[in-house]
């Protein structure tokens, strides 16, 4: 179902319904998000003295938070599906009460020193023991409160997804407020106590929302669907897979981009705050009936950003960290905007709201698992970053709309893929033979200039440039664009480039690389952006 299938009713609700009801649910959702995203930097900063400042600390932490969010959404979906709305609140309030036993937040005894080796699982266990229950209780609120609001019978409940934008706005404020306001003003212990107070306030607000729900006439989401006059069509499995994929790619890109900038661009405290803030901001911008940025403009900006980013990664000699950072921010932000807007356009009727968020969260978890746990074992360098940049082209509307019955289009895609793979193999071979091929006498200065161009930029950059021209010419064919973007990724990781330099080994603590110096006289050892010697 597209965005035209479910018409938001927020303006009508404001006119004909009670502003107080909207305000109560919005404020509760906002407070829940504040707590949800303030506990993440709070506890991670407590863990840093134990595990150090490796990029993997935040990557694994993000993986845990995505997994716990999935558990919370699963709990909310089961609660909404199997417990009547007027009784579900009692169950949720009991869970919140049990979570109080884990407060205030602190490092549990017996978890002060990780075991030898890569402490991936140990860190996940630490987070589960210390903040698992409170995080589960808070994470369930976003879909649960939206489902409750839809069940109140309020006119705005016909499309309660606007509450999700309020939730992400609260998350964004918490995330930015922690490093710049809260942490400099209060210590970790005081912040943990304040978080406990905020949790109690949230429990009271949830109770108010629940009692308000019990006092309303509407008791089910199916009634809300009927009142809206929209058929509550059950989502198909292809639609569910689409939800997962559209959530997976930007989620994995969030972790991959954070790892990339902290490994290959610059290392700085709290560097992860910017990508996560931008990720949350994308929901605020596009998870609404009328996105703040038109989709046509988003698609154009995204296409340009992906091309520029992959071209930059293909160069063995690229610009400084400022240019790399700005390019990375632009491509990550536009990619997440496009994926999340497409996700919003595919949202279901309110009856399937909690299921929608469950699949969305599953995609987030799978993306986090891939980028945080699988990719470091699979790749010797941060190859997942250019891979995910290419995959964002598959998140554009119509990118996967290729029918097996359309033999002509399938043939074109096969020809593009086969030609691209042949070019990836033969072009470097031919360019390597250029100085001794005798072409200098035939072409004169042209061959010499081409040779200098290859020596300066490398085969990967030249091939990526050629693929990018083909990609831009295919602007009316999203499936072809997605395939060509994958060819650009292969050029970046198969040939010497900005992410493939020398010999590398990767571990929990980063990427160790041995490569030639810029003048070619020495072999140098680097760990991320740190030079350890020659």
Regions found by a protein language model. Name each.
Residues 2-534:
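Alpha-helical transmembrane segments of multi-pass membrane proteins
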